[in-house]
């Protein structure tokens, strides 16, 4: 998996427009900031544990990339066709944890991509690949870009990139 594919994968797996749409109206910047920090910590943990996890279940990095692409594709199809329901959220800054960090931003596709990406490129490249997605999420939230059409566009882009991640895994086998 190239670093470019990992960056694009993280952007579409997180889907900044979907995250901006889920941000609480009261204080979206603070919630997105908390969520971004939480997601970064979770990505580092998933990346650091990638090799032991994959070894424990007997899965290769290429197979993990295929699984990541399939998980990303499921989220992308959901974003493309289903309007997100408002998630119940914790009060104040805690809304950045639930629902923003989990389950909106650190969805199964992001978790699998973090594991697959770190096994292939290392944790440092994984973290560097996650930062653009978090910056775009903050920009989308501050600009109020969480509209249904943009969420669907993010889903369409996600389906394309997810397919590329699956193909990357298949070609690596």
State what each model feature region is.
Residues 26-33, 52-61, 83-93, 118-121, ...:
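Interfacial helix-loop-helix linkers and transmembrane-helix boundary segments
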Residues 1-29, 90-140:
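Structural signal for alpha-helical transmembrane segments and their flanking helix-loop junctions
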């Amino acid at each position: 998996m190239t670093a470019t594919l990992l960056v694009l994968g993280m952007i579409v797996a997180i889907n900044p427009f979907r995250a901006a749409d889920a941000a609480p109206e009261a204080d979206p910047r603070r919630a997105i900031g908390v969520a971004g920090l939480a997601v970064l910590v979770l990505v580092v943990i998933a990346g650091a544990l990638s090799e032991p996890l994959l070894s424990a279940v007997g899965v290769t990095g290429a197979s993990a990339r295929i699984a990541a692409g399939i998980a990303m594709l499921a989220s992308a199809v959901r974003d493309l066709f289903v309007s997100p329901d408002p998630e119940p959220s914790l009060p104040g800054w805690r809304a950045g944890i639930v629902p923003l960090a989990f389950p909106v931003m650190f969805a199964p596709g992001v978790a699998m991509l973090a594991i697959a990406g770190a096994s292939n490129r290392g944790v440092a490249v994984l973290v560097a690949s996650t930062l653009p997605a978090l910056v775009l999420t903050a920009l989308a939230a501050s600009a109020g870009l969480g509209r249904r059409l943009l969420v669907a566009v993010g889903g369409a882009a996600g389906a394309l990139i997810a397919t590329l991640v699956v193909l990357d895994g298949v070609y690596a086998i």
